[in-house]
Amino acid sequence: MSLPEGALLFVYTGDGSKVLGGYGAQNISHSGTIATQPIETDDVVIEVQAPAGSSPTLRLSEVNHGIRPLNLRATFGSNFGRASSALTCTPEVVCMPGLDEMKRAVVVVVINGEGVGSGTMVSTTEGGNTPYLLTAAHVLSVNFKYMNIEQQAERTVAIFNYESPSCSGEVMPDLTQSVSGATVVGFDKPTDACLIRLNNVPPESYRPYYMGWTAEKHPGGNYINLHHPYAMTKRVNYYNGNVKVNVTCETDQHYFDDHMHYEVPAWDVGTTAPGSSGSPLIDRAQRVMGGLSAGKSYCSVKSADYFFSLANVWEQKREATENIVRALSPRGSGTLTCDGRDPYGSLRSRARRITHVSSALSGDSLSGQGAQLSSEVILGDADAVGEHYLLKPHTQLYGAYVMLDMSQVKPNELGSEDVSMTLEVYTGGESPAATIPVDLSKIIRGTLSSRQDNLKYREVFVSFPQPIELSDRGELILAIPTQSLPKGVSILHQQYSGAGGQMMIKSGNKWTPRTLTKGTIALWMDPLIGDSEEDQAERSYPLFSLTSTSPEQILLQLADRVSETAELGIYTISGQKVYTATLPSRATILDRRMLEGLGVVVIHVTAGSEQLSIKALFPAN
């Protein structure tokens, strides 16, 4: 297969109700193949859309048809927007601060269209951009059912950034950021460790991160697990105790050697599920210790999960384990730790997504932030609508995320023709610096078919063919001509006084701010920008943050810069002491019930020379 610049490949059901893609040239492996995730259908259409005059080539080499459904409670998109009750205790990663780098390393792993797990992009002691992916051996072999592991690796798809942009999980994320095909580096059944090398380096627009690792036997306490349960959006678990080492993984089938695993006795926040296998156990230093092999944890039942141990991989002297060690630590097994790195960190800038919509950081539903206005109200009689950003001069733009509301689309008015919209990028001039067509046909039809699962909101990622540089003024408007939006499709937005963004409307050649009587509107259109080293140094984060993880629990997280213990004090507004404690870790679970009914309380944290107080309201029930 070969795809010219601008060409896209789609795979969809005969009725267009389920869609995979579009896949571009960046998704093709070195061997010229694209492996796709499974799609539930008995008839399938493979379509290539290419610019006029180009010459794409396509050969269908193999189709795998399963006669039994996948052993998954959810596949991509199903159950989206109403997370299974089995997952209510494991939060969406966007809800939790401090995970910016780590979450970019964790991917969905799809094996030959049949098996699904999680994996982690990992760094090496020599640096470089080699795309090593750490997962579990039982993931690559689909529970050791298929031992032709080289073929399994070649048919592997790694999907990046599959995470909801909203805490409420109402927006289905883009699924096109994938890399297909890999080569086996080391596959070790006794430990369950598996390292593969992707056939292509993830492009910069994917914002990949290669996480550090540790082969130390007893790394420090306070652990994180990032995972894709049931192949759903990325979630996070926390454990504040100490893991058990050299335990025997308890499974129905005795796959692994005894005394090879870490045991997490019970998560303080979270649970795992099918699809979480291979996901990383991460220590306080943000290094991978191993990957999930098996578990018994549930939200309703606190029980153990088991992770293969890189420390035990380092101690084995088999060919497979030595290949893993040699790849991650070319100088030999004497090196036991490696820091994480951004593979594009040596460039002038790194890709970073920014947004004006605060609901991305809230546990409230989008409707709770202010009901979505109709397309007619938002668009009015304007020629175009856009979201205005004022950034640093000469900032580089790599792409944009647009969140669309498809709840008002009527299938009988859609027709059979292709449906598209246009994204325009203004950098200060009267004319757009770039005009990019965006095909929505498959996305809209796929969303409509899944409306029973509340998939009415959809994230669309638009990758720019070439980076766009802002002018000396640093002005940016991401815009959509109103006539290009399909009937019934609107742009997700936030409307209330004090919203962080600024919607603009264009009439003729003039842009003016759009406001309501109650305040401003922010269109949910997020640029992907180059974040320079200076920008990263200038960004500051609060000393701590609070996140409600359940009706009974609150997660208090300290900033990464805190390297010592911190002191916590909680007081009523009149100064009465409610609770004090020493915080030995960056993540601490507080019992929300001790605060209910107290009204306004002051939560105060001191760490070294820094201190911060936050007021919070806990009304009586």
Each language-model region and where it sits:
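Catalytic nucleophile loop of clan PA
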Residues: 120-130, 270-292
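C-terminal tail/sorting-segment detector
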Residues: 119, 556, 596-621
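Beta-sheet-rich sandwich/jelly-roll-like modules and their strand-loop junctions
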Residues: 338-429, 481-531
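Glycine-centered coil/turn sites that cap beta-strands in beta-rich domains
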Residues: 398-399, 535-570, 587-596
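Short, glycine-anchored, charge-dense loop/turn motifs used at functional sites
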Residues: 126, 131, 284-287, 570-578, ...
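Serine endopeptidase catalytic core focused on the charge-relay Asp
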Residues: 39-265
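Noncatalytic modules at the cell exterior or secretory-pathway interfaces
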Residues: 35-54, 468-480
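Aromatic- and Gly/Pro-enriched, solvent-exposed loop/edge beta-strand patches characteristic
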Residues: 269-270, 278, 410-501
